[in-house]
Amino acid sequence: MGLTKSDLFTREQNDLANMAKAIAHPARIAILQYLVKKNACVTGDLVEELGLAQATTSQHLKELKNAGIIQGTVEGASVCYCIDPKVWKHYKNVFHTFFGEVKIEDSTCC
């Protein structure tokens, strides 16, 4: 049995790639920005705010929830979403470390 593509890379590289993938859609960025701005649990107003279909919004929320960056709790017939502060801080630290590791002077490109 051969190696999978993810086996070719370090755990840190795979984790960073998965984190980037989780937020790598403009709708997900918009959702995160909205949740940060509201700084509270948000329910149905996301669909109206984004202008996307309910199913599309739900799919993006599912991806963010699977990544752990948001939490969802059931409140009656709806789900209330908010940023998971612990995971948010982890994302921030990982990306900060990644971009901080490489010191690029004015121009190193050809």
Language-model segments: which ranges?
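Amphipathic alpha-helical dimerization/coiled-coil segments
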Residues: 1-15, 37, 85-110
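N-terminal helix-turn-helix DNA-binding core of bacterial DNA-binding proteins
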Residues: 14-53, 75-87
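Alpha-helical residues within the helix-turn-helix
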Residues: 48, 65-66
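Short, hydrophobic-biased segments on the C-terminal half of alpha helices
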Residues: 61-62
